[in-house]
C-alpha cells in the first residue's frame, strides 16, 4: 500500500476512507511491522466520523452512504462496532505475507432485522483507492458462511454461495450469537475456521493472502469483537 496516497485520501475525503487519530488506542495485537516488510501505517488526522479506536481506518462499500449510526470504539477488553453502512475496518500496520493466522471472536448482541454478514478479511491491497482488493470470510445469524473476493467494485464468490455449517453457532434465546472465526494462511493452502473447526479450504493462489487483515461488517449490526489478532505461523 502507498502510505502517501492513504494520507491524502483521509485528508481530502475524496475516497470512502475514514479514520481516527492513532493515539495508542486498543485494537490489534502484535502491532508493528508485519512480515510484509515494515511498511507501517501513516499518521492519522484527528477526525472522528465514528471511528474512535486509535490507529484504525474504516472504508465504506458505498462512499455515498450515510455514516449515521456508525460507531467503532474500544469496549471492555475488546472492540465494539455499531453499523451503519457495509464496511471494512482495519489497522494498516497489520500488513502480512507468508504463513499467518488472523482471528477474532464476534458476539452479535442482538438479532439483525434480516440476514447480514460479518467476519474477517485478509490480503487487503490498495485500500486507499478504487483498485482495492481483499478476500473476506463472513457468517450470518442463520449459521451460513461465505468466502468472497473484492476487486475494485466487483465481488465474486470463491467457492459457491452461502453454505450451512454445524460449527457456526446460531443465536441463543436472547438473540445473541458468538463465534470465533479464523483464517489460516499457509504456503499453499488457506483454511477457514469457525470455533476451531475447518469449514473450508482453498488454494492460496485462489484468494488474496498478501496484505492487510481486518474486519468485514455488514450494515445495521451491533458487534462485540474480542481477541482480534494476526500472528506469524511457526
Please annotate each region the language model reported.
Residues 7-16:
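Bacterial N-terminal signal peptides
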Residues 19-49:
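Disordered, low-complexity segments in secreted/periplasmic proteins that are enriched in proline
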